[in-house]
A protein has these predicted regions:
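Secreted/periplasmic carbohydrate-active enzymes, especially glycoside hydrolases
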Residues: 1-168
Length: 168
């Protein structure tokens, strides 16, 4: 028998197969760099001329970025629509204040909306940088930064094995 949840997934014959989002920050940590690649697959027998668009909405539902492209999608072939933009003054994501934007991707065939896919996006930048401060061995410390701010990891180093007998 079936022991876990089951659901049916249905998509149009020409639909989003996959997408990739890169949402980071520039060197000032104030301007968002947004890149989106949408892969489409056409399972129909004839080519389609589709309009692919995205809209990035803030927490109040206001569009901060939007763009659309026409794309000719051949049968049985993956086609990719790529978008890239800079967004000044974005609200950054941190663990303490996890600001997220709602991205809505839309596929249209003429005036008919074929598919709408929502996704949440946060703008943040992770880095490892060396400091000017030197450790006891004379090498500089390396610091983990989120949006240019140092993050201190607190924890322990656990090794669940015994050097003489293997696992405990």
């Amino acid at each position: 028998g079936i022991e876990r949840d089951v659901y049916l997934w249905s998509q149009p014959k020409t639909a989003i197969q996959d997408f990739r989002v890169i949402s980071t920050l520039d060197d000032t940590y104030k301007t968002g760099i947004f890149k989106l690649a949408i892969d489409l697959k056409n399972h129909e027998e004839k080519a389609k001329n589709l309009t692919i668009s995205y809209e990035l909405l803030d927490k109040n539902g206001k569009a901060i970025a939007t763009e659309s492209k026409n794309l000719w999608v051949s049968p049985a072939v993956n086609s990719t629509a790529s978008f890239e933009t800079s967004i000044p003054g974005v609200a950054t994501w941190t663990a303490e204040i996890p600001n997220l934007y709602k991205m809505v991707m839309t596929i249209k065939d003429g005036d008919k909306t074929v598919e709408v896919v929502p996704y949440h996006v946060g703008f943040r930048r992770f880095e490892m940088k060396q400091t000017k401060e030197l450790a006891g061995n004379g090498k500089p410390y390396t610091v983990f930064l989120v949006n240019g701010q140092p993050v201190k990891f607190k924890g322990v180093n656990i090794h669940e094995h015994n050097p003489e007998t293997g696992h405990y």
